[in-house]
Amino acid sequence: MPKHGKRYRALLEKVDPNKIYTIDEAAHLVKELATAKFDETVEVHAKLGIDPRRSDQNVRGTVSLPHGLGKQVRVLAIAKGEKIKEAEEAGADYVGGEEIIQKILDGWMDFDAVVATPDVMGAVGSKLGRILGPRGLLPNPKAGTVGFNIGEIIREIKAGRIEFRNDKTGAIHAPVGKASFPPEKLADNIRAFIRALEAHKPEGAKGTFLRSVYVTTTMGPSVRINPHS
């Protein structure tokens, strides 16, 4: 195991490893644990009672956090015709069609989210799949990033909508705000994310769905929480 520095060990002493904290307690505690010189991201890590090898048990969805993420999300919209203007008016940072696909093929990646209309997905998938797919940026209807209602999609992402999906170990990791948020807003965002997770419980999943849930900051130790508190 890697050795942690003195700062981390001091923070670890503030966390009771045998206690399962309420969401409100954790929201206050993680603010104390965020001592880095930058505004740390607060994340939720959940271990799910699913078999990730089975496609019918994979969990994937989106949730609009009530207080956003506390950061500006750079949205790229790929569309054509009238939808280009709609995307621009909705606040997309970059909008284009074939020319922007070529720009990405040339190495440009200055964006955080990609949305597209269905009529361009053939080109997007075939040309950009290998580039955007591994980065989790490829537009997908299940993730709510493909649709002719592209203006609505962009506004939701800008307001703090996040995508979540389990990894190959059956765990999910998602940002829920910044350490600078008031604890009440962090707690609201955590609860909204947990409700969204539970709404996506697969029918075939047996036993306890949320096996363990932790809240952590970018550089701090994790705090186990009761997801129903």
Swiss-Prot record:
Gene Ontology CC, one term: large ribosomal subunit
PROSITE patterns: RIBOSOMAL_L1
TM regions (residue ranges): none
GO molecular function, one term: tRNA binding
Record keyword Ribosomal protein present: yes
Source species, domain of life: Bacteria
UniProt cross-references to InterPro entries, sorted A to Z: Ribosom_uL1_bac-type, Ribosomal_uL1, Ribosomal_uL1-like, Ribosomal_uL1/biogenesis, Ribosomal_uL1_3-a/b-sand, Ribosomal_uL1_CS
Keywords: Repressor, Ribonucleoprotein, Ribosomal protein, RNA-binding, rRNA-binding, Translation regulation, tRNA-binding
Example GO biological process: translation
Gene3D superfamilies: 3.30.190.20, 3.40.50.790
Pfam families registered for this protein in UniProt: Ribosomal_L1
Biological role: The L1 stalk is quite mobile in the ribosome, and is involved in E site tRNA release. Binds directly to 23S rRNA.
Quaternary data: Part of the 50S ribosomal subunit.
Family: Belongs to the universal ribosomal protein uL1 family.
Protein name, per record: Large ribosomal subunit protein uL1
Name of the encoding gene: rplA
